[in-house]
Amino acid sequence: SFVRDDGPLEPHSYYRLGSGSTINASIVGFDPSPKEHEDRITAAISTIQRSVLEKIVLARSVDIQFNPPVDPLAIAARLIDQSHNKDGFVVDLSPAGGRYQGRTLVGSSPEVLIKREGSTVSAYPLAGSAGRVEDRDVDCFIGQQLRTNAKDLDEHTFVVNHLVNVLEPLCSSLEVPNHPELTRTNEMWHLATPITGTLRDKNMSALELALNLHPTPAVCGTPLHAAEDLISSVETDRGFYSGAVGWCTSDGNGEYMVAIRCAEIAAGGASARAWAGGGIVASSSADKELAETTAKLRTIMRALGLQ
């Protein structure tokens, strides 16, 4: 079955007040370890500085156990409750077959890959990020610094250029601001660019648009194939993390989010794996990139009661 609400979403009271609200989680492993991830970032920076590769997104994961087993809807309810925009997703991965039988993807993504309403299309790419802090003045300062940080602006430009290169031939008009805006979740500051356009071919569906756009440099890198090759050589399987999750109606309307801030729950609910990644460019700093993934993981960790 498929249920879609335009939001804000409202979790069922069972998951807030009843036994479904109880989650007992513990971290049991990392892939790779934080130190190994930092070493990978250092190696990637060196590769970028001496090759055609300009940007790569490296991800790491955290393995989690639940006792007793968890209902994925309980995690989704917490994600929605804690989400800045009060939204989230739950996807049964069983149709993918194999090891995905009975597994569930849950998350709350702030990044719109593509949305289509009639002939109007829109996207909201995110790239360039900084973790938020509790002190309000310091938090605002971090956000303002992000707006002018050369490394983050470069990282963001790669993503925007990719979307423009794909969408421009498909649109009779395309509006792209000259500078990104600052947006936030409860855990992160992000650079974001709202892109809107009018389709030439009104029969092109949201799903077709998503397939044309994915993967963007926000989850892979640029040039695409060079980034894909390096990712496949150093990372274990990402599963459905960094993919696209959404919907498309029979008339082609729909919306796809980038599958970030998410976790894959095992069949039976006894364990899960959560991911976070960060964009690496020539001027990146390994320790700061590691800290960025830790900040991004807070979304799912807070939903699990682990932070």
Predicted features and spans:
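Conserved hydrophobic core element of enzyme catalytic domains
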Residues: 194-307
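Residue-level detector of short coil/turn "hinge" positions at structural boundaries
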Residues: 54-55, 174
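Contiguous alpha-helical scaffold segments within structured protein domains
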Residues: 2-35, 39-42, 46, 60-67, ...
